């Protein structure tokens, strides 16, 4: 058998095969380049006696992309001209004839994603959509399973949350606090940044008469933006929330923000002040009309903003991976007359279907990435993140809704939520406001603040590292 030696040759001396029928997209060249950057040039280019490439055209292009001047080559000089022509075809086609054990492949991808490594699983060449489909195949479930949206009766939900509490729910976090306070959001993210946003802020529309009708399901008004704000005030409210979403998410991330048709103007104004681009506006079409006198509203709007200028993720790629997506989303609403709908509506007045959020998450994020929601509501974004292998970071102002999110998570995941920090966010904010007021009035040191210390632990409550976390927050506050 002929012994071959690797030669290191300048790229300029390598000649492409005249009739190379194999094509390489720019995307694939970038993937090969990333593999070479990470693992090295492990597969030498095969050339003939005249430096014509028999195998490795994509690797040579990737090497040029990386700015390399040379590449390792193996010279094959025993073939006839006809053999070479056949080999060039065979080298490309035979690899395509192989298959996959999809269960083993999914397990390997899943374990790679869970390992502590400094590279993304897409370095394997599998797309975000392919990884999602394979791993979801390990534990198949029906899309749009009604059980995903089933919410427990409000009367069955225990009262646990207080303002400022930070909870861990498996890989997810929930904080009870003001989404407009950047310190609350900083506590929630803990130096990480979100890969995408799906959030449903209050619509500045009174719940009574617009969401709650005259039936047995009645709702109190939201804690803020429930119809009491002027146009300017609501625009400022949205702009403050958007500023936090932008600050705590990755450059290039897509932010899905739900809104009623009445406040399109405020959304566009606040969005233009914070986002680089409005990528699209999505219409969620429900299967039944809701409240309304001059036409019953059967849709809601979802604005798809882009944060920053970096390229955004797009996993569906015009249906390339079997997911045909448009800007009209058709999912059933909670006012549909089916079993379980009243329970959902009783938990929260504007529940979004989990299946809809699942699809949005899969469109623009990777498994393991963070999904940020600063208006947690009933917790649908958290359930959707869990189903798709993402990590939710959820903020909700109202302790009652926080209690319902906890209860919903524990029922769905059959896991217990853990309180990991108690009341620090809101108490720190109050303390800082008090300090600022004293400094502004010139009476610092003369007036005693009235900010209360953290309340005594509730029965059965564990407050880990309370002193150290308080010091950490004081230090961060400056």
Predicted feature locations:
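Core catalytic lobe of class I
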Residues: 2-402, 459-464, 472, 477-478
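Polybasic, lysine-enriched low-complexity intrinsically disordered terminal tails
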Residues: 1-3, 434-478
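S-adenosyl-L-methionine
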Residues: 163-186, 406-451
């Amino acid at each position: 058998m002929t012994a071959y030696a690797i030669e290191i040759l300048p790229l300029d001396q390598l000649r492409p095969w005249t009739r190379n029928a194999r094509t390489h997209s720019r995307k694939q060249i970038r993937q090969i380049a990333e593999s070479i950057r990470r693992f090295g040039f492990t597969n030498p280019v095969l050339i003939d006696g005249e430096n014509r490439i028999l195998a490795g055209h994509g690797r040579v292009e990737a090497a040029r992309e990386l700015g390399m001047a040379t590449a390792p080559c193996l010279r094959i000089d025993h073939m006839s001209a006809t053999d070479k022509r056949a080999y060039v075809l065979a080298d490309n086609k035979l690899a395509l004839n192989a298959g996959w054990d999809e269960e083993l492949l999914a397990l390997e991808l899943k374990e790679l994603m869970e390992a502590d490594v400094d590279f993304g699983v897409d370095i394997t060449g599998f797309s975000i959509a392919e990884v999602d489909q394979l791993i979801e195949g390990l534990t198949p479930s029906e899309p749009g399973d009604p059980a995903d949206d089933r919410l427990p009766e409000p009367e069955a939900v225990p009262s646990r949350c207080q303002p400022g509490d930070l909870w861990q729910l498996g890989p997810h976090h929930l904080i009870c606090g003001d989404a407009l306070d950047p310190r609350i959001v900083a506590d929630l993210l803990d130096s990480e940044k979100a890969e995408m946003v799906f959030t449903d802020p209050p619509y500045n529309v009174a719940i009574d008469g617009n969401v709650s009708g005259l039936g047995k399901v009645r709702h109190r008004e939201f804690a803020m933006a429930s119809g009491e704000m002027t146009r300017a005030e609501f625009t400022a409210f949205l702009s403050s929330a958007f500023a936090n979403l932008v600050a705590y998410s990755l450059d290039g991330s897509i932010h899905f923000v739900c809104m009623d048709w009445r406040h399109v103007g405020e959304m566009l104004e606040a969005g233009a002040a914070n986002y680089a681009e409005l990528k699209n506006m999505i219409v969620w079409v429900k299967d039944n009309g809701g409240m309304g006198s001059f036409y019953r509203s059967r849709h809601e709007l979802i604005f798809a903003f882009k944060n920053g200028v970096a390229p955004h993720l797009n996993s569906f790629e015009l249906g390339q991976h079997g997911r045909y997506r448009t800007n009209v989303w058709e999912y059933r609403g909670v006012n549909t007359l089916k079993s379980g709908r009243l329970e959902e509506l009783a938990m929260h007045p504007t529940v979004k279907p989990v299946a809809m959020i699942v699809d949005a998450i899969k469109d623009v994020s990777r498994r393991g990435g963070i999904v940020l929601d600063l208006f947690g509501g009933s917790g649908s974004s958290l359930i959707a993140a869990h189903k798709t292998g993402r990590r939710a970071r959820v903020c909700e102002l109202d302790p009652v809704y926080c209690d319902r999110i906890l209860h919903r998570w524990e029922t769905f995941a059959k896991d217990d939520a853990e309180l990991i920090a108690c009341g620090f966010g809101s108490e720190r904010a109050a303390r800082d406001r008090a300090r600022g007021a004293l400094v502004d009035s010139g009476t610092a040191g003369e007036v005693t603040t009235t900010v209360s210390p953290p309340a005594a632990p509730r029965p059965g409550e564990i407050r880990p590292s309370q002193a150290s976390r308080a010091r950490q927050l004081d230090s961060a506050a400056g």
